[in-house]
Amino acid sequence: MSSSTVEEVEVRGRLRKRRADAGSVRLSERDGQLLRLIGEQYAITVDQLARLIGRTPRTGRWLRDRWRRAGWVESRQLTAAGPSFLWLTRAGTRVAGSPFRTWRPNAALASHIEAVTEVRLLSEQHGLGLWVCERALAKSLCFATPVRAHLPDAVIATGDGRIAVEVELTLKSRARLEALLLELGRDYDRVWYFAVPSLVPRLRELAAALPWQNIAVHPYPPRAAALIA
């Protein structure tokens, strides 16, 4: 076989391989990290994705669309006036190596999920500690004890101990709030409670009456200055 014929065969082979790969999306290390984080949070908004990668909302939408073409995520609004969320498909859960079950969209939880992720973004932006998501806490506790304790929305592990993170967007009964604060204050070194402004006075009053003074109530949305001080 002449050298020119060999070259033609090699070129045709490369073209066939290129056509076979055309349109496919390859998983990068960064893709895997971001997809696993989405699995930890149940879902995130497209705007939150953009901030995670330090890019514009347009780039966040581009990345979301890339993952959607690959079949790794689904994305849509979960409430009529709310933002677009994205969450892992079964294929996305598999390629990311996420240890959690594939989440089924739940409009009733959308605002709370978004709010918890806002706190996580702020915590990680300022290096406040290692974020342990609610899903990981549930996995560890189900093996540790037969008694189901209240799970905070997350725990931030620091050199000084564990900080329970709780986000409250809706009104609960006084008895329920008091029970939550009592349990969290007892079980964790510190508690950061983020609540919509209308709930802050009641929560601060309840926290002040507890036997331990390790609960800080912050208005939501979270502000870095209040946490770093």
Q: How does the language model describe each region?
A:
Residues 64, 68, 119-127, 184, ...:
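Hydrophobic, Leu/Ile/Phe/Ala-enriched alpha-helical segments that form helix-helix packing faces
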Residues 100-116:
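A short, highly charged nucleic-acid-interacting micro-segment common to nuclease
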Residues 42, 71, 127, 188-189:
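Structural motif
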Residues 41-44, 137-139, 170, 199:
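Short, solvent-exposed loop/turn segments at secondary-structure junctions
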Residues 1-103:
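Nuclease-adjacent, charged terminal/linker segments that flank catalytic cores
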Residues 209-229:
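Charged, structured surface patches that assemble and position nucleic-acid processing machinery
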Residues 76-77, 108-111, 120-124, 128-176:
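Active-site metal-binding core of divalent-cation-utilizing nuclease and nuclease-like domains
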